[in-house]
UniProtKB/Swiss-Prot annotation:
Pfam families: Ribosomal_L2, Ribosomal_L2_C. Disulfide bonds: none annotated. Its main location: plastid. It comes from Gossypium hirsutum. GO terms for molecular function: RNA binding; rRNA binding; structural constituent of ribosome; transferase activity. Residues 1-21, 224-274 are annotated as: Disordered. This is Large ribosomal subunit protein uL2cz/uL2cy. Keywords: Chloroplast, Plastid, Ribonucleoprotein, Ribosomal protein. GO terms for cellular component: chloroplast; mitochondrial large ribosomal subunit. Belongs to the universal ribosomal protein uL2 family. It is found in: Plastid, Chloroplast. PROSITE patterns: RIBOSOMAL_L2. One of its GO terms (biological process) is mitochondrial translation. Part of the 50S ribosomal subunit.
């Protein structure tokens, strides 16, 4: 969707850039309320995920990541805003009367038809196993485990590429730059996730970010020594270290954050680029 640029009529709209308005009128049988527990805190009330809290109430939309309506054509009826993700969602009316939400593929418009199955056309929005796709196909919503539903490349603008097939596995290049193996029987959706211009958004003011449930970020250099390794000093002091550190004292730049000895280490041919 297009990016709407605000005029500088008030300080809050200066340099503001948001998505063009996509209305949301969700179906009652495809939404449910969710209790957002703690907003970044654990059961003891201690902050475990910083910079979270507040935000507008949300209703969760049930998204069909499995695409298990096999060989039944569906029609895109609406393209809606989803407060729980950056990507837009589509309401699909299937031929058997079923109604479901899916991620909006880039370029899909109201009235387009989609289908999922084993021998379906290589068309944007269609879902099929990797073994039936030609090399070089752009895909999203990729399964890791057969039947569990898509788990990879689901963010706005995300796209992966099928680069090889050998034996029981297919080789994919993911949006992060990682190259890994996945079973050829796993399914994926053809095309790229829509709303590719989401990274061009500029909220313009702090209040707009608070509506999203994101709290202010404070630099460690302006904290006290008890709160951050960069804190302390008289006036504007340097961090006092050779290299930047996290609030818990670990190296902030270049340290690997992936858990060691995971079962999928053997499936990763090239780790993600920094």
């Amino acid at each position: 969707m297009a990016i709407h640029l605000y005029k500088t009529s008030t300080p809050g709209t200066r340099n503001g850039a948001v998505d063009s308005q996509v209305k949301s009128n969700p179906r009652n049988n495809l939404i449910y309320g969710q209790h957002r527990c703690g907003k970044g805190r654990n059961a003891r009330g201690i902050i475990t995920a910083r910079h979270r809290g507040g935000g507008h109430k949300r209703l969760y939309r049930k998204i069909d990541f499995r695409r298990n309506e096999k060989d039944i054509y569906g029609r895109i009826v609406t393209i809606e805003y989803d407060p729980n993700r950056n990507a837009y969602i589509c309401l699909i009316h299937y031929g058997d009367g079923e109604k479901r939400y899916i991620l909006h593929p880039r370029g899909a418009i109201i009235g387009d038809t989609i289908v999922s199955g084993t021998e379906v056309p290589i068309k944007m929005g269609n879902a099929l196993p990797l073994t039936d796709m030609p090399l070089g196909t752009a895909i999203h919503n990729i399964e890791i485990t057969l039947g569990r539903g898509g788990q990879l490349a689901r963010a706005a603008g995300a796209v992966a590429k099928l680069i090889a097939k050998e034996g029981k596995s297919a080789t994919l290049k993911l949006p992060s730059g990682e190259v890994r193996l996945i079973s050829k029987n796993c399914s994926a959706t053809v095309g790229q996730v829509g709303n590719v211009g989401v990274n061009q958004k500029s909220l313009g003011r702090a209040g707009s970010k608070c509506w999203l449930g994101k709290r202010p970020v404070v630099r460690g250099v302006v904290m006290n020594p008890v709160d951050h390794p960069h804190g302390g000093g008289e006036g504007r002091a340097p961090i006092g270290r050779k290299k930047p550190a996290t609030p818990w004292g670990y190296p902030a730049l270049g340290r690997r954050s992936r858990k060691r000895n995971k079962y999928s280490d053997n499936l990763i041919l090239r780790r993600r680029s920094k």
